[in-house]
Amino acid sequence: GPDLFRLQDRKGNDYLLGPTHEEMFTLMVKGEFSSYKDLPLSIYQIQTKYRDEPRPRSGIIRGREFVMKDSYSFDVDDAGLEISYNKHRQAYINTFDRLGLRYNIVSAMSGAMGGSKSEEFLAPCPTGEDTYVLCNGCGYAANVEAMITKVAPFKGEKVGAIEVLDTPNTPTIDSLVEVFNKKYGANISAVDTLKNVLLMADEKPIAVLVPGDREVDLKRLEANLAGVKELRLFEDADFAKHPKLVKGYVGPQDAKAFGITLYADPRIVEGSHWITGANQKDKHARFVTCGRDFKVDQYIEAAEVRAGDNCPKCEKPVVIDRAIEIGHIFQLGRKYAQSLGLTVLDKEGKPVVVTMGSYGI
């Protein structure tokens, strides 16, 4: 990925500077251990790491070159992984408590590391790179990328067929709301409109649907959009290649015909109806209904998270703060062991794929 530092030697051979060392430790264990009796096993190192951070910070925490303690656990089964994970978690708690640091443990996305679970240790800091949510009611805490939107099924009234209305010079949500209220006597706000954000994902067009009062958080989108290597917003050249997409007046109702994959915020529930683009210049449509007039290909957490949003556990309002990541722990599962052929013989003499964890300060 883009975080890797790549280089070549004088003979043209390709190398990279290690950002982390899951693969190397997996291969090392593969060459040294072969039985369930050798596990559980944890190995650590303290070594310089290199990452081409998009926004390197001054100081010692988030630079492109930094010293990191990384450790790796190896277990026969998931129950063993859970034990190893919790031991490392408690060791980190003991370490940070002994140092007197203020920190929060938050749910996080595993990202390119893979795996089923990860948590970050975040030290609150107004200039920190990470943003997280915290519920003072139940203690729920999560990186904004991992924040879950909890919504109820739509209970509103059914509406009639789509109506296409003249809305000249309304390419923005604010201008659209103004015209609807003044020209058509409506009583709407931005939350009643549907925003269609067009992007190119690995050079294929996609649309992300969010309520009109929200923005798409590209960092959240990238974290939750699995398997996509390159993501960028639509540019004028992309509209030129897709002439049926009218800039400022795009709606989801023709997405399938246009070859667009539809991703939607969980708030775009089945049966909800919206005011959105009519796919015609200077025209918008109302009563565009999810499930009837368009089908969502995949729901995704991509809308911006705000202070005051409901906690997914207790539904009380959350607060938002910034922080510096000082530790990150992962349950990697069998991703690396499967890829690199790390197995051990179990009690019956049968080979089983080892399950792994990764832990870094």
What is the meaning of each model-derived region?
Residues G1-E53, L199-M200, R267-G271, K335:
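Active-site loop/lid in soluble adenylation, ligation, and acyl-transfer enzymes
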Residues E22-V29, R55-S71, V76-I361:
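Extended, low-hydrophobicity, polar/charged segments
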